[in-house]
Amino acid sequence: MQYWAETVESLYRQLGSGPGGLTAEEAARRLRESGPNELRGSRPLSRLDVASRQLRSPLLLLLIFAALASALSGEFVDATIVVAIVIATVGIGYSREYSAQRAAAALRAQLHVRTTVLRDGVPGPVPIEDIVSGDVVRLGAGSLVPADAVVLAATDFYVSEAALTGESFPTSKLPGVVDAAAGLAERTNCVFLGTNVRSGTATCLVVTTGGATEFGSIAKRLTLRPPETEFDRGIRRFGYLLTTAMLVMVLLVFVGHMFRGRPPVETLLFSVALAVGLSPELLPAILSINLARGAQVMARHGVLVRRLNAIENLGSMDILCTDKTGTITEGVVQLEGAYDAQGQPSDRTLELGAWNAALETGISSPLDDAIGQARMPDLAGITKLGEMPFDFMRKRITVALKEGDGVRLISKGAFHHVLEICTQMAPAVPLDDRLRAALETLYEAWAARGIRVLAVATRTIVMQDSFSREDEREMTFTGFLTFIDRPREGVARAISDLANLGVSIKLITGDSRLVAQHVASLVGLGADHVLTGRQLDELHDEALWREAERTDIFAEVDPNQKERIILALKKMGHVVGFLGDGVNDAPAMHAADTSLSVQQAVDVAREAADFVLLERGLHVIKRGIEEGRRTFANTLKYILITTSANLGNMVSMAVASLFLPFLPLTAGQILLNNFLSDVPAVGIADDNLDDEMVKRPRRWDIRFIGRYMVEFGILSTAFDFLTFGLLLGIFHVAPDAFRTSWFVESLLTELVVALVMRTRRPFYRSRPGRLLLYSTGVLIPIAFAMPYLPFAPVFGLVPLPASLLVAIAGIAMLYVLATELQKVWFYRHD
């Protein structure tokens, strides 16, 4: 249906709706039939989805292929061992990841976005996912457009369609009918899912929902993925590093074994086992557990996580950009006074401001609420004829009231933006340069004391059918409304705490330079370097990159300038966070590395945010940053411990296999060893963290990871060859006893050395997490007992003499000491 070319009456008829919308019963029926108003991919992962994610691992698929090859060649024992290892690995990964996904989904469910919908003719909030075709919705500035709809009525209604059409400027939307051949950008009588309202108000009739929308049709053709975070890029680069090392080693071993005439199936199994042994195959599960745990801890501290992968970005953040209202200040605005153009108390100014505040529509402003608390106007006999809503270019709002046979216009807004439409000053004095300078002096005196100022102007015109922004001219400047918003208690301490964490605060505000400087000075923020929106416009990009770093306060800026500031800071290598709650903050939030909003924010700001704060305040963000760093540190801890130990063992095994007349470990033994050593590693997600690990922002450093792997891997290889010398040169063991001894030694050293490598401190001065400590404590005796267990022969393990076990224990203790010394040297030269 080409609904944009249909009349409203025709649409009502085809959709079975009307001006009062649907009945609640009919809406429920349609929801059952059409399903929720969601796009493909927006629903939480099912059990089957999580299980399939485990099986999509290339390494596990390689193992399954190797098991199949073994079975076809008659090696059923080897095939069974490999399949058992695959099932156990998938089981652990599935159980932990599914529980993590459920926990994260439960937290996100607390953040339902609702839209005002007419049901049974009565407006009320309805979750966006419950909207159906035929619903009549009301939208205002800051609203997300919940579905594709036709505009029924609108007042100065502008919609940002950048996400759909690429057009950066908001588009005016009006009721009417357009040509059936009109393209998407030409359908000025329609609004579309995925866009948001920048200004004005409208009533719209929903035509299509979910996958049937214009945005949904794009989603069907594309795999829509969220933007790659810094953490995602780090994981990807680490994957490239590991894959390169793995391919080189496996190819060399495979070619070497084939050259020596080893059986092809045995060579294939051994090579695949080496590849699996080198990889941290539980990394996806560790990531999910880490992120979900981080989200749960952050929720307990008042931060809801909307995008799990952004947690590490929050920990890496070194600059936080924020407005002052509600974050630096209490956000409880009080009317300080109402004054005439001479700066004297004025009841008339308050009366006009109260009428304007009470009759305007759109976003509820704390300033308007403060006016209403000071003066609740008597609207009896007042007839509103029209409105020119607030927008972020004009920074004012004008209402038109019937007054006798004429019309009174009342404008209220930012001082300079109201002054620019005035030609005289109350009572009826022409505004010359001298009077404008006097008004400017009054304004600056209040602003220098941190007092916010709105100006009020009025004009009487003849009756007319409609009103527009062109009527905002030749106004009479009536007076000032002044407001106070005191600094939040404890904010100076929170700013200091963030500075101690390596995070600097930059104020980005639409308020005046003087107000911003005054507030910043009260709470201990830098206020020496200030850049105004007008000055910012005069800077080319490269100049702004340098200037942004040294600037403490960006004042009198518009939404596009906020975004430009964020991009400039990122260009200088910073990880930038942005805290916003208004419709004008959305572009900057999308540009930031990590974005935060508050529960009371407009829809578009909450949807743009990675994190939603349940209460305002920098102290809440501090907790989130610390948890982000804990999550990152424990993930990196698993990678460093696992890959360095695995690299050392696999290099030892690869080299030994080329020179020994037998395999140093069978494929089944390699896989069992790798599986058992990974079990305690799951506990790293809940491991304790040394305080110094959260003191500074941390970012991915692939060179650091590579150096760590090589240096500690070499140490591991050295002790492996020490073990080989002991087994062959002193104990003269047979091949089965050699494999069993090295299996026990390799498993034992991986278990105990994890307790050493998990901390930069001496290991005895850093307490491990309970799960890591207990699981390691259980597996150490199991490692010694493995050769004597009933299933040991299945894996080719044989009993060992007590003297050999004592020697292995001695090597493990010596390895712990050497690792501790190597750790001190490594971090001293890092």
PLM-predicted stretches and their roles:
Residues 73, 77, 81-112, 119, ...:
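Hydrophobic alpha-helical transmembrane segments
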Residues 253, 284, 527-578, 592-762, ...:
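Membrane-embedded transport module
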Residues 34-68, 101, 122-124, 181-190, ...:
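Soluble-to-membrane junctions at the N-terminal ends of transmembrane alpha-helices
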Residues 190-196, 313-476, 483, 496-497, ...:
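Cytosolic catalytic regions of ATP/NTP-dependent phosphoryl-transfer enzymes
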Residues 158, 165, 175, 330-350, ...:
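Basic, amphipathic juxtamembrane/active-site segments
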Residues 61-81, 241-279, 292, 296-302, ...:
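Helix-interface capping motifs at the ends of transmembrane segments in multi-pass membrane proteins
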Residues 492-494, 500, 512-523, 560-568, ...:
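Acidic, divalent-metal-coordinating active-site segment for phosphoryl/phosphodiester hydrolysis
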Residues 1-132, 137-145, 150-158, 162-169, ...:
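Non-lumenal N-terminal regulatory segments of integral membrane proteins
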